[in-house]
């Protein structure tokens, strides 16, 4: 056991050291406006050479530092959370492979090497989702893998299409792609790949299903790695989205995703799925602001979101760990009395998610919403942005109401405490980052900020939407004296919203059902029907008839021999006469 513990600790120390080093480097690159291209010649044979290119700028270095910081804390946290697991060694290796795939994707300016990291993320995520090896995990892993395969195919098609340029280093050809309609196909394929990885409609169903993975994986996957890979890829291709049809389409899809996830989280009772739907909502927000053209804002929110979302998942993991793997929030309640540190960190992460002033989420979300108010867009897009923000506060309040207030609703055979210092250290470190991370990043990334001039009522609109969302969360959560839950009055609407607009059903049964039925009819009608009648059975009958004729010839019948002799004589005489 000590060997495994040291394995976790060593990984933690190495990753956190590299993370701080990369962060300092990213500040230097940002202040001095540096970009490094490093070419590594892998094979050189006569006139042929295979060269791998790496791109280092402030954005890639800062993103890598955040990924490694969260990965190191997740591995440290797993030391206790997965401590009793027999295969913890394998688990840590899978997490490290996952992080390496993400590193490959971040520093690649080349579609081929991006595909290596992209596929690595997909394959290792499958191994992590099925880690617990039960039927639910296998189904979730298959849904995750197959959804991401669509994005892999789109990237492969983009690679094939880029053969027109003679190089796969897309970074040099973005302006050319923007001006050439035929090459905008590459932008469309890359956008499709990003939509599958970042779980936008209609590929949203895999993200809550992936909650079958261990909680440390959820903290890593849903904060800074797998789901943000699509957003990061589109940040690199941001020129193609600016003032284009692709950007308008992405704005519609991501806005609907944001709204759907926020609405669904208000009708969900699984603790991890609520946080997963919250992630989906924030991904929709990032994609939306990216489609308008503010890629730096999308990157800023990506980093701040990584901090408080990892903290949310880690706190949820501590709660699940202490309540003997119970995830239904209706069986919780009163946790703040027994787990004060965890609940404090959980509430800080929730407030950061809602956009509470001076926490990490406030600096990015408030800036995004004020920028949206300055942008030219129709009322529908405007409504999606602000209504989804209100829904975020609504489900956050509901989550706290169910899990942390009132009386404990589960069995009494639970040891609720905050005594695990390993998990407590990880969540406390992330809590500090969730408090100071937003202000620190806003000072570093926007050292020449633009002034946003808005009327008084628009300036306070974001705050009013948040307060209204919190009040609505209280109303739909509160059970009155006659025990009529407000969220169950309109059952059909609740069922529709709670099932993510039937997205999981459409993605699984909807895709498979009709091809299976058509395949069965084809098998019955053709394989066992006409093709059997005209193929196997008829061939057998014809051969049987011909074999009977042959048997007649073999009976040594004198009449048949004379007849055949006369027939051949007639044929020969006729041929001789015809030739003469």
UniProtKB/Swiss-Prot annotation:
Transmembrane regions listed in the UniProt entry: 12-32, 50-70, 92-112, 113-133, 153-173, 176-196, 218-240, 249-269, 274-294, 300-320, 343-363, 378-400, 427-447, 464-484, 500-520, 560-580
PANTHER family per the UniProt record, alphabetical: NADH-UBIQUINONE OXIDOREDUCTASE CHAIN 5
Protein's organism: Aedes aegypti (Yellowfever mosquito)
Protein task: Core subunit of the mitochondrial membrane respiratory chain NADH dehydrogenase (Complex I) that is believed to belong to the minimal assembly required for catalysis. Complex I functions in the transfer of electrons from NADH to the respiratory chain. The immediate electron acceptor for the enzyme is believed to be ubiquinone.
Keywords: Electron transport, Membrane, Mitochondrion, Mitochondrion inner membrane, NAD, Respiratory chain, Translocase, Transmembrane, Transmembrane helix, Transport, Ubiquinone
Predominant localisation class: mitochondrion
EC numbers, comma separated: 7.1.1.2
GO cellular component, one term: mitochondrial inner membrane
Protein name as it appears in the record: NADH-ubiquinone oxidoreductase chain 5
Biological processes annotated in GO: ATP synthesis coupled electron transport; electron transport coupled proton transport
Family (UniProt): Belongs to the complex I subunit 5 family.
Compartments, as annotated in UniProt: Mitochondrion inner membrane
InterPro entries with a match to the protein in the record: NADH_DH_su5_C, ND/Mrp_TM, NU5C-like, Proton_antipo_N
GO molecular function, one term: NADH dehydrogenase (ubiquinone) activity
Catalytic reaction(s) noted: a ubiquinone + NADH + 5 H(+)(in) = a ubiquinol + NAD(+) + 4 H(+)(out)
Membrane topology term: Multi-pass membrane protein
């Amino acid at each position: 056991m000590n060997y495994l513990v040291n394995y976790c600790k060593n990984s933690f120390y190495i990753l956190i050291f590299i993370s701080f080093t990369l962060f300092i480097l990213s500040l230097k690159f940002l202040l001095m406006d540096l970009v490094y291209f490093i070419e590594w010649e892998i094979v050189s044979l006569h006139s042929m050479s295979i060269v791998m290119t790496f791109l280092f700028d402030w954005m890639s270095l800062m993103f890598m530092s955040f990924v490694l910081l969260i990965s190191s804390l997740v591995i440290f946290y797993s030391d206790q959370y997965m401590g009793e697991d027999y295969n913890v060694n394998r688990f840590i290796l899978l997490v490290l492979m996952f992080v390496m795939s993400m590193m490959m994707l971040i520093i690649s300016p080349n579609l081929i090497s991006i595909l290596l990291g992209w596929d690595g993320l997909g394959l290792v995520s499958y191994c992590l989702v099925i880690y617990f090896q039960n039927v639910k995990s296998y189904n979730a892993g298959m849904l995750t893998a197959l959804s991401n395969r669509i994005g892999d195919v789109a990237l492969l098609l983009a690679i094939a299409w880029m053969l027109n340029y003679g190089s796969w280093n897309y970074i040099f050809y973005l302006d050319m792609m923007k001006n050439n309609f035929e090459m905008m196909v590459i932008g469309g394929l890359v956008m499709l790949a990003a939509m599958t990885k970042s779980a936008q409609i209609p590929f949203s169903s895999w993200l809550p299903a992936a909650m079958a993975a261990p909680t440390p994986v959820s903290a890593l996957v849903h904060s800074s790695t797998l789901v943000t890979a699509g957003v990061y890829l589109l940040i690199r291709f941001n020129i193609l989205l600016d003032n284009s049809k692709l950007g308008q389409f992405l704005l519609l899809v991501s806005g609907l995703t944001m709204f759907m996830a926020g609405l669904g989280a208000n009708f969900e009772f699984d603790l991890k799925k609520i946080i997963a739907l919250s992630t989906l909502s924030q991904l929709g927000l990032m994609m939306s602001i990216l489609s308008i053209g503010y890629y730096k804002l999308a990157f800023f929110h990506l980093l701040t979101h990584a901090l408080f979302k990892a903290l949310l998942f880690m706190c949820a993991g501590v709660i699940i760990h202490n309540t003997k793997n119970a995830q239904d929030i209706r069986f919780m309640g009163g946790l703040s009395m027994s787990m004060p540190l965890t609940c404090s960190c959980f509430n800080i992460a929730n407030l950061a998610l809602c956009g509470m002033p001076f926490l990490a989420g406030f600096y990015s979300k408030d800036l995004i919403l004020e920028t949206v108010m300055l942008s030219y867009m129709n009322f529908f897009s405007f409504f999606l942005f602000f209504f989804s923000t209100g829904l975020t506060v609504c489900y956050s309040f509901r989550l706290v109401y169910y899990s942390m207030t009132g009386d404990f609703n589960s069995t009494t055979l639970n040891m609720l405490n905050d005594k695990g210092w390993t998990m407590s250290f990880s969540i406390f470190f992330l809590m500090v980052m969730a408090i100071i991370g937003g202000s620190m990043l806003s000072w570093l990334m926007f050292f020449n900020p633009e002034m946003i001039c808005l009327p008084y009522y628009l300036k306070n609109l974001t705050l009013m939407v948040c307060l209204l969302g919190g009040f609505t969360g209280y109303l739909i959560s509160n059970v009155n004296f006659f025990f009529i839950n407000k969220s169950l009055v309109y059952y059909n609407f609740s069922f529709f919203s709670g099932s993510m607009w039937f997205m999981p059903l459409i993605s699984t049964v909807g895709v498979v059902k009709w091809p299976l039925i058509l395949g069965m009819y084809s098998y019955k009608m053709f394989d066992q029907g006409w093709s059997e009648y005209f193929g196997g059975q008829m061939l057998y009958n014809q051969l049987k008839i011909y074999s009977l004729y042959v048997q007649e010839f073999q009976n040594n019948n004198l009449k048949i021999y004379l007849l055949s002799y006369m027939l051949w004589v007639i044929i020969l005489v006729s041929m001789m006469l015809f030739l003469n």
